[in-house]
């Protein structure tokens, strides 16, 4: 089945900030423990949902509307694969949230500065890939429509799937 978007870091960061505001105490032990689990989870996403290794993600997850025009987790009848704008956006957000957590942990443990830099760099790779998949000039963004679309790859050809939904916002 479809996987749900990687919102773990966003949720942990929100819980941490709300608790800190409510109690006046920064419980970084919680943040650090969950951060290490999310490092493993992030690696799973990169290894399983970026099968082409180009920082554009696929694999069926939606999250906002959860209703696709077709089953994005099943093999396509035409072969090929779909580069998903929503999945790629979710992973960009995951990077930014992990970076924020690493920066918070770096306040007392400078070793996390390098980890924060890693997530900033990965975010930049994702942003670049959305505008130039694998350096081939293929974009998820459509300048004319001012909208992000999924891209269907079959063999050496590609085409934007111009179906407007929450996916492209």
Model-predicted regions and their roles:
Residues 3-14, 88-103, 164-169:
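Well-ordered alpha-helical segments within folded domains of soluble proteins
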Residues 152-153, 157, 161-165, 169:
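Polar, glycine-rich mid-to-C-terminal structural blocks
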Residues 2-3, 54:
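Membrane-interface helix-loop-helix modules in multi-pass inner-membrane proteins
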């Amino acid at each position: 089945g479809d996987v749900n978007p990687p919102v773990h870091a966003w949720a942990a960061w929100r819980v941490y900030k709300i608790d800190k505001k409510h109690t006046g105490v920064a419980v970084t032990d919680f943040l650090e423990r969950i951060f290490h689990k999310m490092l493993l989870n992030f690696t799973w996403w990169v290894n399983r949902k970026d099968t082409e290794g180009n920082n554009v993600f696929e694999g069926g997850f939606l999250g906002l509307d959860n209703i696709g025009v077709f089953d994005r987790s099943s093999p396509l009848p035409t072969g090929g694969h779909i580069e998903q704008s929503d999945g790629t956006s979710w992973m960009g957000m995951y990077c930014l949230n992990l970076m924020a957590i690493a920066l918070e942990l770096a306040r007392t443990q400078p070793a996390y500065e390098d980890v924060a830099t890693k997530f900033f760099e990965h975010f930049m790779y994702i942003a670049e890939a959305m505008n130039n998949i694998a350096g081939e000039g293929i974009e998820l963004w459509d300048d004319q429509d001012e909208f992000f679309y999924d891209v269907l790859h079959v063999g050496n050809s590609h085409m934007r799937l111009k179906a407007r939904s929450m996916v492209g916002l």
